[in-house]
Amino acid sequence: MFKSGFVAILGRPNVGKSTFLNHVMGQKIAIMSDKAQTTRNKIMGIYTTETEQIVFIDTPGIHKPKTALGDFMVESAYSTLREVETVLFMVPADEKRGKGDDMIIERLKAARIPVILVINKIDKVHPDQLLEQIDDFRSQMDFKEIVPISALQGNNVETLVQLLKDNLEEGFQYFPEDQITDHPERFLVSEMVREKVLHLTQQEVPHSVAVVVDSMKRDEVTDKVHIRVTIMVERDSQKGIIIGKQGAMLKKIGKLARRDIELMLGDKVYLETWVKVKKNWRDKKLDLADFGYNKKEY
């Protein structure tokens, strides 16, 4: 008997949702950084064994939006509640329950689907503090299970996955066993470039960046995959930061991104990077759609 199911990973920004998904999948599906709101789109991670398939949906961190992009991200996250049988509500062990958590809990109660509370980053707290966190959240909602983990170190992750397997119902194998995500290679390439921008820049720059893959094709002469990407920013000053002195920052972004893209594609890559200014794109719906933040997602 084959069993399958869809599982959403929900929570505030920076609680470790993407780290968890990447650990379960055994490779990078979702980009990671220490910046809030790193994940902007829903990312599917397809975990398949001989007898089960769990389709994880990693979601943007739920926050109080200040732009049209923020609205898109939050609605995209909540839309998964219509698509899944189980929700993993992830919270950090080293932060007390806040208004953001309470807001999510109210939406989860209204959704009327099983919710597993996942308390991440247990490696950062004393066991007594963890017990306080468990008691506090337990008083707010009737969770199906409460599972403390460390997604970074892998502590208890297998236990959580086994719990999900045990609760799967008989179902179809929705995706081939060798497919690990629903996103095309172009999307993954753009995300890998954006990840390097997030790692290398500060303040408002990371949040103001979108990456568009203009072209991606094999060069018959060099036998490399030739990729041209454009990094979009909102202001000229941000463009200057991305390019850097004598182009040094842009070269660094390109070098680090190319390495990851080559690992993903298993191929040699020539990566061409450009930077353009598109003023206030985060509040323009047409620009959002052009850059891959489309309402079709929800």
From Swiss-Prot:
Q: Which residues are recorded as binding GTP?
A: 11-18, 58-62, 120-123
Identify the stretch(es) annotated as G1: 11-18
The Gene Ontology terms for molecular function here are: GTP binding; GTPase activity; ribosomal small subunit binding; small ribosomal subunit rRNA binding
Q: Please name the InterPro entries in this protein's record.
A: G_ERA_dom, GTP-bd, GTPase_Era-like, KH_dom-like_a/b, KH_dom_type_2, KH_sf_prok-type, P-loop_NTPase, Small_GTP-bd
SUPFAM superfamilies linked = P-loop containing nucleoside triphosphate hydrolases, Prokaryotic type KH domain (KH-domain type II)
Annotated GO CC locations: cytosol; plasma membrane
KH type-2 domain span: 201-279
Compartments where found: Cytoplasm; Cell membrane
Q: Tell me which UniProt keywords the record has, alphabetically.
A: Cell membrane, Cytoplasm, GTP-binding, Membrane, Nucleotide-binding, Ribosome biogenesis, RNA-binding, rRNA-binding
The UniProt family comment states: Belongs to the TRAFAC class TrmE-Era-EngA-EngB-Septin-like GTPase superfamily. Era GTPase family.
What is this protein identified as? GTPase Era
> What's the gene?
era
